[in-house]
Design a protein with these regions (language model features):
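Catalytic cores of RNA-modifying enzymes
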Residues: 1-206, 210, 252, 256
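An accessory alpha-helical subdomain
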Residues: 188-195, 200-233, 238-253, 257-258
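Generic C-terminal helix-cap and adjacent flexible tail
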Residues: 260-262
Length: 262
C-alpha cells in the first residue's frame, strides 16, 4: 500500500489519524514486504494482526492462504476494514481487554505497536499465544533498549527478561518516519521473535513481574509469601551478595529460581 493509496482511503472514508490511539499508518511497500517475509507465514497458518489500522499489512495478508484475525480498537477503521476485507475476521475490540479470540490456535502474531501500550500488548501475547511460532512487531527504535537490554542496567525489567526467555530476537530493519502517514518524529524498528518450544508459561511470567514489583527492593522483599529458606539458599548458592535485587539476575536465573520455589 503506497502513500497515495493511504491518503485516498483516508479521504474517501473520512478517516483522520487518532492521536489517542497512537495512529501512524504505514505506507511503504518495501517495509510491508519485509514484515511479511520476516513472519515466515505458511499456508494454513492462523495469523493474528493487532491494530491493522488502515490495512497496509492486511491488504497483503488477506490474499494469502491463511486464517487471518484482525483486532482493531478504532470503530471507524473497523467499519472500513470490514467493507474492504469481507472475508477476514475483524474483531472490534481493545486487544488488552479481549478474551475469547482463540489465542492457543495462533501461529503468527504481527503488530505495529503504539509505544504507550507496547509492554502491555507484548506481555499479553507472551502469556496467551502459547503456541505461536513467530512474532513480528514494529516498535519505536528507542523502545529496543527495553526489549534487548542486559541485566543490571536501568532499562532491564520484566519485558527484557520474558522476551529473552521466549525466543530468539532479531532486529529486521529500521523504519524512518517518512514511511508513515502522518509522519512521526521518531524512527521505528521491526523485530522478529522465533519462539522457543520451552517458552515461559503464564505462571513464570507472573513470577518475573513479581520479582520486579518494586525495583529498589530485594528479591526477598518482593517475594513475600515464598519459602524464605529456599530463597536464601538459592541466593547464597548463586550470588556473592545476599541482599540481591531482581535487576542483577540473568533471564535464565528467574526460571531456575521459579523452579526452586515451586
Amino acid at each position: 500500500m503506497t502513500r497515495d493509496q493511504v491518503l485516498q482511503i483516508m479521504k474517501e472514508n473520512n478517516i483522520l489519524p487518532e492521536a489517542g490511539f497512537g495512529q501512524n499508518f504505514l505506507c511503504d511497500e518495501e517495509i510491508i514486504d519485509g514484515i511479511i517475509d520476516a513472519a515466515g507465514i505458511k499456508p494454513g497458518d492462523t495469523v493474528l494482526e493487532i491494530g491493522p489500522g488502515i490495512g497496509a499489512l492486511t491488504q497483503q495478508l488477506s490474499s494469502l492462504d491463511i486464517n487471518l484475525i484482525c483486532v482493531e480498537i478504532d470503530k471507524r477503521l473497523v467499519s472500513y476494514l470490514r467493507k474492504a476485507y469481507p472475508n477476514t475476521e475483524i474483531i472490534d475490540s481493545d486487544f488488552l481487554k479481549l478474551k475469547d479470540y482463540g489465542a492457543e490456535k495462533i501461529d503468527v502474531v504481527i503488530s505495529n505497536l503504539p509505544y504507550y501500550i507496547m509492554t502491555d500488548i507484548m506481555m499479553k501475547v507472551f502469556e496467551e499465544a502459547v503456541n505461536a511460532r513467530k512474532i513480528v512487531y514494529m516498535v519505536e527504535e528507542a523502545a529496543l533498549d527495553r526489549i534487548l537490554c542486559e541485566s543490571s542496567t536501568k532499562s532491564y525489567g520484566p519485558l527484557a527478561v520474558v522476551s529473552e526467555l521466549y525466543g530468539n530476537i532479531r532486529v529486521v530493519t529500521k523504519v524512518p518516519g517518512t514511511c508513515f502517514v502522518p509522519q512521526p518524529r521518531t524512527t521505528s524498528a521491526v523485530i522478529s521473535i522465533d519462539c522457543h518450544d520451552n517458552r515461559p508459561d503464564k505462571d513464570l511470567i507472573v513470577f518475573i513481574k513479581k520479582c520486579f514489583a518494586q525495583r529498589r527492593k530485594t528479591l526477598s522483599n518482593n517475594l513475600k509469601g515464598c519459602d524464605k529458606e529456599k530463597l536464601n539458599k538459592w541466593v547464597k548458592d548463586n550470588f556473592i551478595v545476599e541482599n540481591i535485587r531482581a535487576e542483577a539476575l540473568e533471564p535464565t536465573d528467574f526460571r531456575d529460581l521459579f523452579n526452586t520455589l515451586k
